[in-house]
Every structure is written in C-alpha cells, then in structure tokens.
C-alpha cells in the first residue's frame, strides 16, 4: 500500500516531489527514497500515527500516506509539534499564526531523540508557564490568575510570566501570597 514513484525511464525517484497521489486529488509534498515515499511505516520514527524523519539536517513529519505535514500537528497521545510552511520542525519559543491558533505563543523542546525533540513543553521555561507547548496566561483583563498545570499551582500574569514571590491581587480583588510549595508550584 506504499506510494511509489518512478521517473519516465523507469528510475526510482529519490528526493522531494510535489504531486497528487493516486488516491488523493489534492497535491502534497512527498519525500522518496528508492522510489518509495517516506511515511509512518517507512524510513521514519513512528510517533503515534505519524512518521518523523531527519532529512539533510532538518526534521519533517509524514502521515500514513506519505504526505508531508505542516503547521501544528497533534499526535494521538496529545503531544504537539510544529512544522513551518516548508515542513521543517520548529523548536524553542515560537508564535503560531494559523487559522486555529492565531498569534499564540508555544514552546517546543530543543533537545531529545527524534520523536521526542520538538514536542510541546510542560512547565516553567525562562519564567513563563507552558502546558503541552502552549503559553498559559491570565485571562485578558485579569492582572493575575491562579492556574494548575501538571498538578502544580501557579499564579501567572497576562503575558504568562509566573509570579514567584510577594503578594498579588487579581481582578476580583483576591489576594495571593506567593511562596514556593513542596510540589514545585508557587
């Protein structure tokens, strides 16, 4: 059931090809090795329904039909990865501008093995709080908000910065004295 591609002289295709597959009229990018498209089950590290592969120093994602994926990709286990419009995995802090997540800030891990590197980070990074990659912040109009992420309680401001000491008052007049608690939150 693998997608195969041969040139007119019968040579097996190697490299990138933008085309429609026989069972899909929509054109997509595919990467071929020895005439066969990279997919979830070929030349990739399988990650919950997708195949992730390093090609010429960049990391890409392919679905089971071999189509290169772009944008925010959510795996069946809930992990998220981000691939730019050229299909290259992005790591670190980025702003995602697409139809579903207009101007949202994410943080994707910068180290780890293939299939783990680039997944959405959960916890505090550079003073900001993230959950599955997405920046957690106080609701608009609230100066501070108490939130729970991964079983730990934090107080964050509208820009997602974690308050680590002192006393703060939220928009409803509720005061919070900030101290580090035993489970790692504040």
Task: Map each language-model feature to its residues.
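Extracellular adhesion/carbohydrate-binding repeat motifs centered on closely spaced tryptophans
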Residues: 1-186
């Amino acid at each position: 059931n693998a997608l195969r591609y041969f040139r007119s002289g019968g040579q097996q295709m190697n490299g990138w090809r933008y085309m429609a597959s026989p069972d899909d009229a929509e054109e997509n990018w595919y990467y071929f090795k020895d005439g066969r498209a990279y997919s979830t089950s070929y030349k990739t590290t399988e990650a919950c329904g997708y195949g992730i592969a390093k090609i010429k120093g960049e990391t890409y994602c392919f679905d089971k039909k071999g189509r290169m994926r772009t944008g925010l990709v959510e795996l069946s286990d809930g992990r998220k990865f981000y691939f730019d419009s050229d299909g290259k995995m992005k790591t670190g802090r980025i702003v995602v501008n697409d139809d579903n997540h207009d101007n949202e800030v994410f943080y994707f891990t910068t180290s780890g093995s293939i299939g783990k590197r680039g997944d959405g980070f959960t916890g505090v990074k550079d003073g900001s709080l993230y959950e599955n990659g997405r920046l957690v912040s106080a609701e608009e109009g609230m100066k501070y908000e108490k939130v729970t992420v991964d079983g730990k309680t934090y107080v964050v401001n509208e820009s997602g910065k974690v308050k680590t000491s002192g006393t703060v008052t939220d928009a409803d007049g509720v005061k919070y004295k900030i101290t580090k608690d035993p489970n790692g939150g504040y």
